[in-house]
Amino acid sequence: MTVQLGAFYLFPLFMAGFVQTNSNLEKMDCYKDVTGTIYDYDAFTLNGNEHIQFKQYAGKHVLFVNVATYCGLTAQYPELNTLQEELKPFGLVVLGFPCNQFGKQEPGENSEILLGLKYVRPGGGYVPNFQLFEKGDVNGEKEQKVFTFLKHSCPHPSELIGSIGYISWEPIRVHDIRWNFEKFLVGPDGVPVMRWVHETPISTVKSDILAYLKQFKTE
Amino acid sequence: MTVQLGAFYLFPLFMAGFVQTNSNLEKMDCYKDVTGTIYDYDAFTLNGNEHIQFKQYAGKHVLFVNVATYCGLTAQYPELNTLQEELKPFGLVVLGFPCNQFGKQEPGENSEILLGLKYVRPGGGYVPNFQLFEKGDVNGEKEQKVFTFLKHSCPHPSELIGSIGYISWEPIRVHDIRWNFEKFLVGPDGVPVMRWVHETPISTVKSDILAYLKQFKTE
Amino acid sequence: MTVQLGAFYLFPLFMAGFVQTNSNLEKMDCYKDVTGTIYDYDAFTLNGNEHIQFKQYAGKHVLFVNVATYCGLTAQYPELNTLQEELKPFGLVVLGFPCNQFGKQEPGENSEILLGLKYVRPGGGYVPNFQLFEKGDVNGEKEQKVFTFLKHSCPHPSELIGSIGYISWEPIRVHDIRWNFEKFLVGPDGVPVMRWVHETPISTVKSDILAYLKQFKTE
Amino acid sequence: MTVQLGAFYLFPLFMAGFVQTNSNLEKMDCYKDVTGTIYDYDAFTLNGNEHIQFKQYAGKHVLFVNVATYCGLTAQYPELNTLQEELKPFGLVVLGFPCNQFGKQEPGENSEILLGLKYVRPGGGYVPNFQLFEKGDVNGEKEQKVFTFLKHSCPHPSELIGSIGYISWEPIRVHDIRWNFEKFLVGPDGVPVMRWVHETPISTVKSDILAYLKQFKTE
């Protein structure tokens, strides 16, 4: 099932000034020879009620984000809401994965995470408009399998991996996620397309996605 | 100025079944030859507005507690409210010191801590009825001076200090605080009287304080 | 079986100028209520050929030392030789336990340790004139049982335990050995008598032992 | 000054059975667009007497190796002697850099390293027939500049970087050297040509160098 994008939807957004095209240094195109798709993997929703097979997102453009409540980048959460809203018509689905491996900035239980987002940080009643999954590892021995697949389908994000004081997983690998709020875009066929470092502004992520959608449209 | 305790106030509480006397192993009587008092020290209130000199608590029985929002013992917070309420008439003042050194379970900024307590953990609208101070260290090179004084005025709480994965201070010392929610009782003369390990139930802390107040009264 | 000490042997040594009596701060008298003896424990000799039951030292005054080749204190090795030689007539037996837990300064295999001492540090053909045992842990989960017994039979040596960069055992305990070359003296009944911090000069250890032997003699 | 290689010297070695060509997975060809050469860097010899500018090796094929005495791979030392001897006629110069960053397996002082090699490991009177330099870092904030240049001139050697227990440098980077005995071959123009992981047998390193020399000869 492929997503039909009306070019005329894309163009206004592309030009609407929401989009600052940063250098591609931050965007990494994933490898061309990836075998397998995200459809081989699954996860429990944050409230533990639903076991979601990622193949349910076949045909969608899925943005995987490892998130945390008490991070200096937690302000990206509301921006992800905006991104989800704006690009939903184009088949974008944002998925959030709380993780406590980066400076232990997601200390809450699954049942506490939405409360923390709503009342503490970003606070002000914030509620994600995209699916969050159960807290889990994205690096190291107990990393969630979908993140093993995503990480090794794309170039590593930076020469710097981190400092021992903030690394709480074993072993340390080149393709490890560097910090909260790294992002992977997966195409409608379940194959990873792009990866962004955590500091990449959402606006850049958005413009990269729009450019990709446009190109996807013409192809 | 010494606190006049009506023995008849103490006795009912002592017997009222709220009190389970645990073995004294958990309570440690501080050293008799302590020099100096807490009145030499000070701290900023959690909101940063007030610089409090601890000598303002002269004549009070002050309970110092290092606290954290996302700790397995955070349920002690409401119990500390009850303790403060019940023993306020006897001159007890509870003081809370948020600290992120134990498993990094206090990741929030000062401005976020009360929100986390109110809405996330313990949540349910909880508001401490005692003073909280600015987040700070209680162990290691940058430990708050009052905690240096408190720790070295009393025996260390346990043979086990901890595991490297959860110790995020330097250097490691015998008298270091072991985890969130350790407690020190300071007498009305500013001299430390008792120290409890973090796991000590508040009910035991209460009965120890009542026994101490009773003895203090008769002396 | 008690060691008969000729007082006249002790006195000249005591006065011979080899002995500088340092403050007792460095010496710690072990606890009086110790149960058990070193005779419950054993170890393999460095070359692995012999399994030594410590009860074979019944009647002797045994000095346990955790040693390392590449330590700033390795110069104590030749001084331990001198100590063994001088106090052998009085029943002193020095036992060395190579250990790699302090800054990883004993990296060699058992078969390499004597070579390292002889040719590298202290070098110059040095050969210990006392028994060395197989390399093993003295702190943490896999610590040798005799060191668990020794450590908990005596006060801990210092408030400072160490810095995380140099601590490679789990968990961290108050009575842990602080560095290479700590020493425990055990009486002829197998019960620990004294403990010294690593920096204590051997001359001080010697004078403390002589004073103890003298007292032991009169008692 | 370029090295004239008599093809007839290369061919017999290439075929002489000393050479097992392993998969190139272990060999990494350095980047083509490297700017700068090793000639911009220098180091002090192990005994501290000589300050060597690497430009003195212009025209030579230089093999940089970070070494350690108490490593499971220290047996590569005698093999490096053989390599130096066999390929000296073809302009190969082996340079060894003792480093204590991998499991702290080079604890000795500069003055002790040759003693350790000669009498302990590999022992048996072993003396390197190639230049050793002063002990120093090859990763992290204080890494020697020549290793910064070498590491970033070639692909990183493996996805696995290591486990926190054995990493004693900050920060951790993708191109960091993984363990003792990694190797870099630098051409006669001072530009890095090849990099090998630490486990690569010296025989493979040799056959890779011979193949390179042969190709270098024909070009």
From Swiss-Prot, chains A, B, C, D:
The active site is at C71. InterPro entries: Glutathione_peroxidase (IPR000889), GPX_AS (IPR029759), GPX_CS (IPR029760), Thioredoxin-like_sf (IPR036249). Its EC number is 1.11.1.9. GO terms for cellular component: extracellular region. It is found in: Secreted. Residues 1-21 form the signal peptide. Keywords: Oxidoreductase, Peroxidase, Secreted, Signal. Proximal caput epididymis. Its main location: secreted. It catalyses: 2 glutathione + H2O2 = glutathione disulfide + 2 H2O. It is an enzyme of class 1 (oxidoreductase). One of its GO terms (biological process) is response to oxidative stress. CDD domains: GSH_Peroxidase. One of its GO terms (molecular function) is glutathione peroxidase activity. It comes from the Eukaryota. Homotetramer. Belongs to the glutathione peroxidase family. May constitute a glutathione peroxidase-like protective system against peroxide damage in sperm membrane lipids. Since the purified porcine enzyme has very little activity towards hydrogen peroxide or organic hydroperoxides the protective effect is not likely to be exerted by its enzymatic activity. Instead, may protect sperm from premature acrosome reaction in the epididymis by binding to lipid peroxides, which might otherwise interact with phospholipase A2 and induce the acrosome reaction. This is Epididymal secretory glutathione peroxidase. The lineage of its organism: Eukaryota, Metazoa, Chordata, Craniata, Vertebrata.
